[in-house]
Amino acid sequence: MDLGIKGRRAVVCASSKGLGRGCAEALAAAGCDLVLNARGAEALEQTAADIRAKYGVNVEAVAADITTEEGRAEVLKAAGEVDILVNNAGGPPPGMWSDWERDDFIKALDANMLAPIAMIKALVPAMMDRGWGRVVNITSQSVKAPIGVLGLSNSARAGLTGYVAGTS
């Protein structure tokens, strides 16, 4: 199936494994050049090498923590003109509501809501100016049907979903 995105440039966050890697591979198979991001350099570089070898597209790997301004700046500097943004983040871990402290919520919000919003705000204006762009936010079915032990994830991912619904 031709998605009509060959030659486009995509940023894929948390792309060294799991859903992020799957998204990166699907975009590469469709002919997109990629900027991959994850915190772990070794796994990220291996993913980038695997995708380059298999799909023959340009792949840049940026090992950085996207939840920090510095990490986002590194990714955005490498990214240049972006057509597609895939926001993705792992975690936060399951647990009991009675065990979560404010810092647990802040970490969950940073990774699963605030960093994606910052990436959207950084990249979407240029997409709008060019008249073309796509944003994919990997969240969870728990934004519609919360899961008890995933309260940190439920709240942060639902916040991102609400933000996007309010801006689209």
Each predicted region: which residue ranges?
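Conserved glycine-rich cofactor-binding loop
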Residues: 9, 16-18
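Conserved glycine-rich Rossmann-like NAD(P)H-binding loop of the short-chain dehydrogenase/reductase
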Residues: 32-46
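The beta1-alpha1 cofactor-binding region of Rossmann-like NAD(H)/NADP(H)-dependent oxidoreductases
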Residues: 41-42, 63-74, 102
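Conserved NAD(P)H cofactor-binding loop of Rossmann-fold oxidoreductase domains
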Residues: 89-93
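Substrate-binding pocket helix/loop in short-chain dehydrogenase/reductase
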Residues: 96-98, 104-109
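A short, exposed helix-loop element centered on a Lys and neighboring polar residues
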Residues: 120-121, 165
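Catalytic loop of short-chain dehydrogenase/reductase
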Residues: 136-159, 164-168
